[in-house]
Amino acid sequence: MNSREKGKRGERRWRDMLREAGFQKAHRGVQYAGGTDSPDVACPELPGIHFEVKAVEALNIWRAMDQSIRNAGVRKTPVVAHTRNRSGWLVTMRADDWLTLIRQSDHVAATESPNADSLPFATTPTPAPSP
């Protein structure tokens, strides 16, 4: 199988994963144009995300992220969804974007720290291990 076919197959697998997660309108993007209107996979339910999809054994994640950043433009969050043979999917994004996303989620625990407002996100102290 050539790399173009492998790429298409990876894009279809990522699209299917999004659909299984409830994002039923996910579809492969327009591949001939490049740029913000042509992510590898588009998902109308996640309008602020630009997906670049990579299905390769040895991924240069920096190059893939650069492509996603360049193609995402200023209004979308660049995300690289990547996998390799016999492996699950990984998602790579910039730390600032991840922190923004996690702050908006229900994964942030309340804290009693008086300086909680100065933290980029709330934290819960980890209990000391038992002897």
Question: Model regions: which residues?
Answer:
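Catalytic phosphate/metal-binding cores of nucleic-acid and nucleotide-processing enzymes, i.e., regions
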Residues: M1-P131
